[in-house]
């Protein structure tokens, strides 16, 4: 009996052990006793005379046949016939009640039916059947043989077939040689050798008929490519067998094919294996560590290596450095500023130019001039002006249109508002601008005044000056650049190369001439305010901050600079109650050409340099008079120093007094 059949292994679930029944071992025990006993008697009592009388090859031949028969008998008995492991308990909880009884598959174009096995809980493969004796589904089940006490299936059918063939031949040999011995000893039948030979011949003759019949039957089945179960049940009796390959191929497949795999594992004892944790080095001695030299030739001891390893595995990596969101303080030197002009400064972050949400007005009007420009109810500074620190605050990009640029150039045109050019820009056109600190305005005004003084000293014509830094565009231009492309460094610093520069050119036009009687108001007003472009680098912006304007003194030469033509009439200022917060801004004063967005840059320049004729004479433009007055108001008494021209980014030329 195959012991391994009742116990499962590692490849599948173990089959339930069969109950012990002594009746199962009677046939196999009888077959083994007759086979071994009869052959032993034949070899002991009959073969010696055959070897003496005929040849010694006869006993040797019978021994070989007997051993071959016994080997096939043992293989057919103890080998796994091809038992399928049973399904898990949780796999058939739902399928057991709903699964159909049969399922059809196609094999070589022929429909083959598979039956549901309720015991093993799966559909049996083709040519598979459930053995009622072994209580297992066997692949290519042939039959259950009681003489070998095992099922004959795919894995052991070859040995069973060879056992039948060899047993038939062995029975024929034993019976024939025994008959030969009796024929030569007819007068000595009373001897022991003759009696034993007659008994062996009877047993061989008794088993020859069924064994020979069974062998012939299986020869026919092998030639046809069928199994005993298929032949008995008549599955392919009236049709075509899809598993046959011809007579010779079928015989070759049974005798010479490779061994089929085993589906049930063998029962093995558990083995204890020591497995070291991963990523751990084996312990090393001090001698081994001393002999180990690193790549740089430095030897380290075991303790130092353990410390380094513990630090590398336990210590957390350092966090990444936090980005610096503000420009650090840099040394304010002229050499650094000039050297930085030759290099491309880094692209500034966009979050520095977002509008400040703390501005009180809708358009982020400066809090210093909110009460004076919008409401008109006070001519003094608001007490709510925040105290600015040393670090500049970059909130937004103002638009230097109309009078705002003139306030940066002249510094004395904001007479109506009382705070320089910014007040004039708010009075004309009613435009409001983003807020920025007074420190930046003063630094920009000082830079502009220095450039005007140096230009007047060198006897140069005072043309329209462009604000320090690059030419800034309006928020509309920046929005167009953001919508049409990225705010790269080139597009921010050189807007004249972009197509949006033309749309913003009218905001950069020089201002109209201002009446000279407003100069007196500007002389006693707040310090001249200016504008520093936020697109400049940190070094350029810090360099402009250190150039603080000198105290402004009235120039004694103001009497020589009188306008030839009479100034136009000035519109009366609005009373504090004349206009509310929601009312539209006042229109331009009579006699002044309104500065709208239709005026281009060239038109503004033409108005400045176009000579005006009064009584056939040529008079100086008001813009020139205005700039001369601004120049004499600032630094007319100080001796002129050297002027250094520096070309900045965006095509802007700077005149720096050294």
From Swiss-Prot:
The chain crosses the membrane at residues 25-45, 57-77, 160-180, 203-223. One of its GO terms (biological process) is positive regulation of pattern recognition receptor signaling pathway. The keyword Amino-acid biosynthesis does not apply. Residues 1-24, 78-159, 224-658 are cytoplasmic. It is a multi-pass membrane protein. Its EC number is 2.3.1.225. Residues 46-56, 181-202 are extracellular. Belongs to the DHHC palmitoyltransferase family. ERF2/ZDHHC9 subfamily. Palmitoyltransferase that catalyzes the addition of palmitate onto various protein substrates and is involved in a variety of cellular processes. The DHHC domain is required for palmitoyltransferase activity. This is Palmitoyltransferase ZDHHC5-B. It comes from Danio rerio. The gene is zdhhc5b.
């Amino acid at each position: 009996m195959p012991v391994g059949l009742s116990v499962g292994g590692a490849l599948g679930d173990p089959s339930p052990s069969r109950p012990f029944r002594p009746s199962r071992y009677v046939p196999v025990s009888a077959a083994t006793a007759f086979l071994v006993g009869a052959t032993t008697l034949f070899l002991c009592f009959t073969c010696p005379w055959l070897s003496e009388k005929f040849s010694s090859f006869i006993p040797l031949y019978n021994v070989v046949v007997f051993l071959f028969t016994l080997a096939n008998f043992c293989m057919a008995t103890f080998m796994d016939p091809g038992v399928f492991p049973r399904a898990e308990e949780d796999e058939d909880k739902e399928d057991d009640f709903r699964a159909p009884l049969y399922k059809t598959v196609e094999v070589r174009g022929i429909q083959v039916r598979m039956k549901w096995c309720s015991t093993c809980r799966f559909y049996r493969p083709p040519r598979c059947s459930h053995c009622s004796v072994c209580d297992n589904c066997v692949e290519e089940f042939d039959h259950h043989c009681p003489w070998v006490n095992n099922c004959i299936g795919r894995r052991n059918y070859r040995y069973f077939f060879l056992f039948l063939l060899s047993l038939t031949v062995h029975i024929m040999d034993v019976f024939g040689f025994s008959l030969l011995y009796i024929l030569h000893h007819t007068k000595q039948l009373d001897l022991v050798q003759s009696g034993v030979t007659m008994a062996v011949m009877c047993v061989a003759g008794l088993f020859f008929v069924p064994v020979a019949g069974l062998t012939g039957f299986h020869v026919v089945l092998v030639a046809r490519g069928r199994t005993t179960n298929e032949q008995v049940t008549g599955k392919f009796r009236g049709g075509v067998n899809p598993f046959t390959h011809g007579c010779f191929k079928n015989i070759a497949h049974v005798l010479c094919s490779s061994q089929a795999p085993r589906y049930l594992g063998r029962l093995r004892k558990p083995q204890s294996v020591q497995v070291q944790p991963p990523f751990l080095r084996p312990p090393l001695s001090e001698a081994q560590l001393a002999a180990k030299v690193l790549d740089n030739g430095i030897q380290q001891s075991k303790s130092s290596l353990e410390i380094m390893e513990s630090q590398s595995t336990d210590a957390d990596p350092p966090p990444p450095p936090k980005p610096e969101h503000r420009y650090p303080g840099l040394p304010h030197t002229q050499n650094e500023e000039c050297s930085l002009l030759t290099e491309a400064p880094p692209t500034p972050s966009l979050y520095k130019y977002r509008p400040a949400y703390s501005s009180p007005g809708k358009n982020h009007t400066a809090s210093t001039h909110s009460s004076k420009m919008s409401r008109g109810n006070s001519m003094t500074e608001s007490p709510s002006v925040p105290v600015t620190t040393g670090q500049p605050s970059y909130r937004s990009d103002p638009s230097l249109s109309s009078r705002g640029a003139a306030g940066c150039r002249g510094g004395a045109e904001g007479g109506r508002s009382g705070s320089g050019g910014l007040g004039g820009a708010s009075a004309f056109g009613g435009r409001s601008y983003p807020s920025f600190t007074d420190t930046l305005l003063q630094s920009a005004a000082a830079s502009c005044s220095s450039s005007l003084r140096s230009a007047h000293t060198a006897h140069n014509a005072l043309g329209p000056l462009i604000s320090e830094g690059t030419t800034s565009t309006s928020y509309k231009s920046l929005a167009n650049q953001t919508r049409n492309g990225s705010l790269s460094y080139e597009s921010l610093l050189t807007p004249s190369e972009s197509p949006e520069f033309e749309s913003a050119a009218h905001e950069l036009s020089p201002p109209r001439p201002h009446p000279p009687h407003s100069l007196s108001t500007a002389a006693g007003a707040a310090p001249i305010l200016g504008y520093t472009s936020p697109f400049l680098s940190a070094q350029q912006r810090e360099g402009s901050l250190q150039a603080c304007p000198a105290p402004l003194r009235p120039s004694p030469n103001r009497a020589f600079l009188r306008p030839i033509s009479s100034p136009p009439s000035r519109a009366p200022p609005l009373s504090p109650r004349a206009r509310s917060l929601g009312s539209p801004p006042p229109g331009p004063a009579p006699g002044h050409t309104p500065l709208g967005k239709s005026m281009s840059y060239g038109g503004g320049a033409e108005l400045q340099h176009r000579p005006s004729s009064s009584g056939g004479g040529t008079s100086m433009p008001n813009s020139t008079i205005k700039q001369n007055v601004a120049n004499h108001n600032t630094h007319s008494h100080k001796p002129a120093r050297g002027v250094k021209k520096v070309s900045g980014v965006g095509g802007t030329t700077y005149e720096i007094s050294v």
